[in-house]
Amino acid sequence: MSDRLAVLPQYLLPKQALTHFAGFVASRERGWVTTEIIRRFVAKYRVNMSEALDSDIASYLTFNDFFTRALKPGARPLAQAALVCPVDGAISQFGAIEHDQIFQAKGHHYSTTALVGGDAALAAHYQNGHFATIYLSPKDYHRIHMPCDGRLTRMIYVPGDLFSVNPVTARGVPGLFARNERVVCVFESARGPFVLALVGATIVGSMATVWHGVVNPPRGKAVREWRYPASGQPEVVLRQGEEMGRFLLGSTVVLLFPKGPLRFNPDWEPGRAVRLGEAMADVAADSQR
């Protein structure tokens, strides 16, 4: 079966209603029922609970509490690299941005402008730059961390669809990551600006950041934007490896970096499993002379 045919049912499903229902159920305390759901989930997806800060599944009051579980200190050491991987997951794609086009899958590209919600001036910073797209499967740790030190300057909520973001859907739905609901976070770093976008999906109840809390719901039809620092509030500065947000059920992150001598980890390739804290990219050695 072709990828386009495989994703056809997703066009027909009531994705918003399913996602709302999943979020409702996942946030409710149901005692032994919750524990049994978690137990079955752990068994089905082979979740490694030994690395969780709390490995006792009966201690989680809701499925969301389990899904956003913390890791034990030292479970994800940081590599010595300019940029470290911000999540556990699998590489969807990475590489150069061609003018303003990001490669999604064979035959599919989407623009940086579309990804960030139509702001052409913001997108222009990443023309001919670099990108990385990482998919978080249900078994993965679902907190998102900083690839490098950064100071938050903007956050943009972009309403959209709620297609699944698994590899089959990425190959079958044009412009998937610029089509789905997303939260675009813009940071300033020592090497210039960068974007870390959290892309929603079917059953993803919500996305949250450490400085704002839950961004969605409520879901709306209009782009919403926040500028930082907010009036009367201190700057939001996060260090490399520090948590910046989380998914309540899994999805995808897309990172954008400006044009420059960035060299991705030579071991990286599409489909490869990656872990939070491993080396993602460094500045090319010849540019430091």
Swiss-Prot record:
Sites of Pyruvic acid (Ser) modification: 251
Coiled coil: none
EC category: lyase
Membrane topology, from the record: Peripheral membrane protein
Annotated catalysed reactions: a 1,2-diacyl-sn-glycero-3-phospho-L-serine + H(+) = a 1,2-diacyl-sn-glycero-3-phosphoethanolamine + CO2
Catalytic residues of the enzyme: 88, 145, 251
Pfam families the record matches: PS_Dcarbxylase (PF02666)
CC per GO annotation: plasma membrane
Record flagged with keyword Plastid: no
Superkingdom: Bacteria
Feature type site, description Cleavage (non-hydrolytic): 250-251
Principal location class: membrane
Keyword Lipid biosynthesis: yes
InterPro entries: PS_Dcarbxylase, PSD-B, PSD_type1_pro
E.C. number(s) listed in UniProt: 4.1.1.65
Keywords: Cell membrane, Decarboxylase, Lipid biosynthesis, Lipid metabolism, Lyase, Membrane, Phospholipid biosynthesis, Phospholipid metabolism, Pyruvate, Zymogen
Subcellular location: Cell membrane
GO biological process annotation, one example: phosphatidylethanolamine biosynthetic process
HAMAP family listed in its UniProt record: PS_decarb_PSD_B_type1
Subunit structure: Heterodimer of a large membrane-associated beta subunit and a small pyruvoyl-containing alpha subunit.
Function per UniProt: Catalyzes the formation of phosphatidylethanolamine (PtdEtn) from phosphatidylserine (PtdSer).
NCBIfam families reported for this sequence: PS_decarb
Protein name: Phosphatidylserine decarboxylase proenzyme
